[in-house]
């Protein structure tokens, strides 16, 4: 398969996800709360929310929980679970963090364009 064919396929899949965004956001939220508990908050942020989403953009989702692991191994297992059943070309970039890191780091970069799911 040529590189251009891969890009075209990725764009088609991304358009399908965007068209039905809530169909995909709700399972992510439900799974996050199931595995990390009811204190978990899920947010949409980044270029998609700002309205300057382009062909190479992703859809940024931030999962904030007191139970969020710090270690990469545990974190990657949760991230895989949150995107279970999605296409390999899915446009979601899921960030998993604790409330402390959210307050002290993410809020420095995310000023106003953030929406709780």
Protein language model regions, located:
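Residue-level detector of short, conserved catalytic/binding motifs and their immediate flanks
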Residues: 59
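Catalytic core of pol beta-like nucleotidyltransferases
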Residues: 1-43, 49-56, 65-117
